[in-house]
Each structure stands twice: as C-alpha cells, then as structure tokens.
Regions:
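N-terminal secretory signal peptides and thylakoid transit peptides that target proteins
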Residues: 1-15
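C-terminal edge-of-domain segments
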Residues: 181-188
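Amphipathic interaction/junction segments at domain boundaries or subunit interfaces
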Residues: 65-147
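Short secondary-structure junctions
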Residues: 159-167
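Short, solvent-exposed loop/turn elements at beta->coil junctions and helix N-caps
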Residues: 170-175
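Active-site nucleophilic cysteine motif
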Residues: 148-152
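C-terminal segment of N-terminal export signals and the immediately downstream linker at the start
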Residues: 21-62
Length: 190
C-alpha cells in the first residue's frame, strides 16, 4: 500500500526525470526523442502495471461479491481496511493518539477538504479533498462500489486508535457509489 507521502515522492521523481530529459535534450547531438526514451518507457511500463493490477483487483472484488453474502463481504472488506490502516500506525496514527484535533489539522493540511469534530455528540465528519478515489487498488469505473466497505474499516481503525475508543464509520457519499466526493461520518461508540 502506497501512502500519500510515498506517492508525492514518486511524483517528484518523475518530475525530476522530466527535467533530466530536458537537460539531456539540450546536449550537443541529442534529440529530445532519444534523450528520454528510457524514462518515458519506464513510466509507461509502471503505469501499465498499475492499470493491469487495478483491473485484476476489480475482478477479484467482483469474485468476492459473487461468492460471499453481503454480511461476509462487508466483514472481509472492513478487515482489509483495518489492516491497511495499521500500515499508517507508526508514521501517522500513533503520533496523534489522544490528539484528535492535531490529526484533523494535519488532515486539513494534506488530504481533507473539511473536518468537523463535535466532542459532545461524539461525531467526526470528514470530507476528502481528492477528486478521485485515494485507494491505489481502485480503478474508478471498474472497481465495484461495494469495495467502499474497505475504507470504512480504515476509518474505524484509524479513529479508534487516535481516540482510544471504539468508533463506527458511515459513508455519507462516495465517488465509487456515484457521489462527487467521499464523505465520512465517524461516531464514537459509548
């Protein structure tokens, strides 16, 4: 699972490769076509692998939908999301244990368009700022909307870790389910 920080580093590396291509193209005897063919081929190969992996994963999700009841599928995807959240434990979640406001501030700086916390009501509402699904396994238009149950597991694991209390996550809106954005409502379980 790639995190946002690694993704941004990868983007920076590809930009640096583009700048390197420009510099190579300025050298005597070089053409822009031969100066960057390797970098462009590598980028194309990586993108092809990503696309193929996402399509295969979408097929895997479809197989799960056919073979498991809705209840079993939800548990499976929820557990998958919880496991994914664990990969962020050391780098993100543990830093904000007991500091939900600090976590929400970091989220607003990086991946949340909106975040509200009503401590008295025990609710947190998050609006993701990304115009596309942030899961690197998802290919919009191919991955079934049922896979959004995975992100509910991620949200529950992340917020229960930070708050030190069990929570329940609901999806108010989802890109995969036809929405314009992803919106989560997190409720602390009393």
């Amino acid at each position: 699972m790639i995190d946002r920080k690694t993704f941004m580093k990868s983007c920076a590396a590809f930009c640096a490769a583009g700048i390197s291509c420009s510099a190579k193209a300025d050298q005597p005897g070089a053409t822009s076509q031969n100066a960057c063919s390797l970098e462009q081929n590598q980028l194309h190969a990586v993108q092809g692998k990503l696309d193929n992996g996402q399509l295969r994963f979408a097929g895997f999700v479809e197989s799960i939908e056919k073979r498991f009841s809705e209840s079993e599928r939800r548990k499976l995807f929820n557990g998958f999301g919880r496991q994914c959240a664990q990969t962020y434990r050391a780098s993100l979640l543990d830093r904000y244990k007991g500091n939900i406001r600090g976590f929400l501030d970091e989220g607003l700086r990086n991946w949340m368009a909106e975040a509200s916390y009503d401590e008295a009501a025990g609710t947190i509402r998050i609006v993701d700022k990304s115009p596309t699904c942030t899961c690197p396994l998802v290919k919009e238009g191919s991955t079934p909307p049922s896979f959004c149950d995975c992100t509910l597991g991620w949200q529950e694991e992340a917020y229960s870790t930070i708050l030190g209390k069990p929570v329940h996550a609901e999806l108010e809106e989802s890109l995969l389910r036809g929405g314009k954005r992803c919106v989560f409502l997190i409720r602390v379980i009393a």
